[in-house]
Design a protein with these regions (language model features):
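Beta-rich catalytic cores
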Residues: 58
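Charged phosphate-binding loop/patch that engages nucleotide di/tri-phosphates or the phosphate backbone
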Residues: 131-153
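Acidic, Ser/Thr-rich peripheral helices and adjacent loops at domain boundaries
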Residues: 123-128
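Acidic-basic catalytic patches of nuclease active cores, encompassing PD-(D/E)XK
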Residues: 6, 11-53, 67, 152-153
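Mg2+/Mn2+-dependent nuclease catalytic core
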Residues: 79-97
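Conserved catalytic cores of phosphodiester-cleaving nucleases, focusing on short active-site segments
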Residues: 62-64, 70-80
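Nucleic-acid nuclease catalytic cores
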Residues: 95-122
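Short strand-connecting beta-turns/loops that link adjacent beta-strands
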Residues: 67-69, 109-110
Length: 153
């Protein structure tokens, strides 16, 4: 089921609409939510949990699990320009926890999806287009890398 919620700033007006499951065209999803749906669909061997943690700043968006490799985390980012923006807490997380943690970036204009190691965060802050990725637009390869026993797969 899909609920659309629109709030008008300045005037306290909330419009809550229930839309049938099969008519999602009336609900607009944020680009990060669309990326989340794409990740779930294209990585079936991974059990995903989307984290919306306001109490632990910097924690990545996704917790992944597979019986063979255990847990790992992924940050989802939408690139609207050459630089990817990260909060100071996100930067600290990826710099201090580079093993088994990843960053998945989707280019907003081209739609390309790229997988990066956490250690690539410094390059992503400058220009994601010039930062070497582990995989581009190859979901089978992305899934294999996420499931690899070591982050240097």
């Amino acid at each position: 089921n899909c609920f659309c919620l629109s709030v008008k700033i300045g005037v306290l007006a909330i419009n809550l609409t229930y839309t049938d499951l099969y008519d999602r065209s009336q609900c607009t999803m944020k680009p990060e939510s669309k990326l989340w749906q794409k990740i779930k669909k294209n990585t079936p061997k991974i059990q995903w949990t989307r984290l919306e943690s306001w109490s632990s700043f910097g924690t990545p968006d996704l917790l992944g699990y597979n019986d063979n490799c255990g847990f790992f985390m992924c940050e989802m980012k939408i690139a609207r320009g050459p630089k990817i923006s990260f909060s100071p807490h996100q930067k600290l997380f990826h710099v201090t926890r580079p093993k088994r943690n990843f960053i998945i970036v989707q280019d907003a204009s081209l739609g390309h999806v790229k997988l990066y190691e956490s250690s690539s965060i410094h390059g992503l802050l400058v220009d994601h287009r010039e930062t070497p990725s582990l995989a581009i637009d190859d979901w089978q390869h992305i899934e294999r890398l996420l499931l690899a026993a070591h982050s240097d797969a």
